[in-house]
């Protein structure tokens, strides 16, 4: 399994994080604690959402490189649908990482 992390930070105002949170409410959520939830997204699967004051972190698992690319496209599309940008990076900064460890909440 390939762990994928997308960290979303605002370039301007933190209000864009609230817009993303609102957009994600259309998906099925299971609240884990004050800052973490599991979200089910079609074509992606389970996503661990960690909600911070200045960022939102989305973590998912891919079975192979093709699925990794699909997850990256789907998450990017959802962020773009929530916060359309005329110039990429003008409102949000997206940072992709591929950690070595699988988050505990995504292990089965």
Q: Where are each of the predicted segments found?
A:
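Short Lys/Arg-enriched alpha/beta "domain-start" segment
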Residues: 3-24
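Residue-level recognition of well-ordered beta-strand positions that form the cores
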Residues: 7-9, 59-61, 97
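Structural preference for solvent-exposed beta-strand-turn elements
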Residues: 34, 93-108
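Short, intrinsically disordered low-complexity segments
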Residues: 33-65
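Regulatory modules associated with amino-acid/nitrogen control
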Residues: 27, 73-74, 107
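Intrinsic-disorder/low-complexity, polar/charged segments enriched in Ser/Thr/Lys/Arg/Asp/Glu/Gln
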Residues: 1-5, 55-57
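C-terminal structural segments of small proteins and small subunits
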Residues: 62-100
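Short secondary-structure junctions
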Residues: 25-32
């Amino acid at each position: 399994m390939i762990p994928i992390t997308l960290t979303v930070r605002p370039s301007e105002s933190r209000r864009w994080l609230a817009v993303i949170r609102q957009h994600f409410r259309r998906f099925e959520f299971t609240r884990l604690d004050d800052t973490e939830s599991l979200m089910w997204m079609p074509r992606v699967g389970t996503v661990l959402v960690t909600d911070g004051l200045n960022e939102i972190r989305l973590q998912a698992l891919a079975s192979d490189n093709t699925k990794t690319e699909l997850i990256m496209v789907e998450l990017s599309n959802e962020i773009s649908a929530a916060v359309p940008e005329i110039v990429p990076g003008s409102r949000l900064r997206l940072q992709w990482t591929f950690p070595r460890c699988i988050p505990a909440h995504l292990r089965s």
